[in-house]
């Protein structure tokens, strides 16, 4: 089997970087870092501040703010949440979405009104009201969340474009020309997210200031390329997966976020507004796997100037349900009101040290493997003369080596089935708890079509586990 990854950068450009010996610069590109925080948010805001992150992503739910009619507003919970963020010197990315009953065109598939396509002419005026109220405090507005998942939006791409994105973007820019439109916030699950992004950019790319998406896939082990038996973070980010057997294509995944952006000539920055990994507090292996996943996300981000913001999912394990995506656990008896997982201390180290995040140290003392050679900081990385040295060495250009490069060719045996599993939610395998990998999923045998369908179902189940609670 050969797993061919379609690259966006030319081999000549990559070779030029290697020959020049230039490292992939990241300090010159400031990066934004934050957490998703839900409405019962005090602990989440505190954890975000304590991690040294500068942003929170909140849900400004339409059905809460305008529950009864177009004429009645209730801003109470959002005023408190936004003011709480500002009091902690945090910036806010507000997700404006979810349909109230009075604005629903129809409940096409059952399950309530919140994921319904809104009636024409209803969403834009609400976005105008949001921006007018908060533009002195909030400058970034994301238009809906994961509209390609039925849980959050029942419509087709054209419904999203016509009823949500275009009227919403026009409303933001009209009410606040300096404010930023972020979107479409697609989940990288299944085979259609690339098509969704293709349609949105084809119809309205000029209205987007920041392209956003969500990736929960894991990272392949060093030396294995960007994934052979399952989809990887790299394939969803920038280089989609094609599986060939004997020179015959047997599977092709969705185009990645960056490939679709390049197809449309989009030069707006990319923000990953959800990514993360579950970890049960007190389980050392899971906490370490979560820490490693966070580390890998930031290392990859710092080698890609076009990717300028990451919002992790999420700040804290919100009671009473057993959600474990957070980096802290609510505990009123603990100092600060929470108990921290390992990822929090790691983020404190990175944000206080790495210049791209406003830190005051260097690559050799920032907690990251900046040159992607498997060694972190002085003295482990022998290319660092001291902890104060400026550079760990040269990172492979994107799409090469351990930075998402093609995997070694394999010709023997049948192809492994493609997996579309939300790897961030899978329990860690024992061998995947060290720095070699961020998350692991077990591969299953079977025909490609059958397993692909099962994989999508599993991915949706895991996505719903993240989000089946009041946001």
Task: Locate predicted features.
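Substrate-binding cleft and catalytic face of glycoside hydrolase catalytic domains
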Residues: 47, 51-195, 218-221
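Extracellular calcium-associated, cysteine-rich motifs in secreted modular proteins
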Residues: 356-405, 409
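A cross-kingdom C-terminal cell-surface attachment/processing module
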Residues: 449-469
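Aromatic-rich peripheral "rim/lid" segments of glycoside hydrolase catalytic domains that contact
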Residues: 133, 147, 282, 289-296, ...
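Noncatalytic carbohydrate-binding groove/subsite architecture in carbohydrate-active enzymes
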Residues: 124, 158-288, 337
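C-terminal low-complexity, Ser/Thr- and acidic/Pro-rich disordered "stalk" regions positioned immediately N-terminal
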Residues: 394-442
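Boundary/entry segment of secreted carbohydrate-active catalytic domains
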Residues: 27-61
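Bacterial N-terminal signal peptides
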Residues: 10-21, 455-461
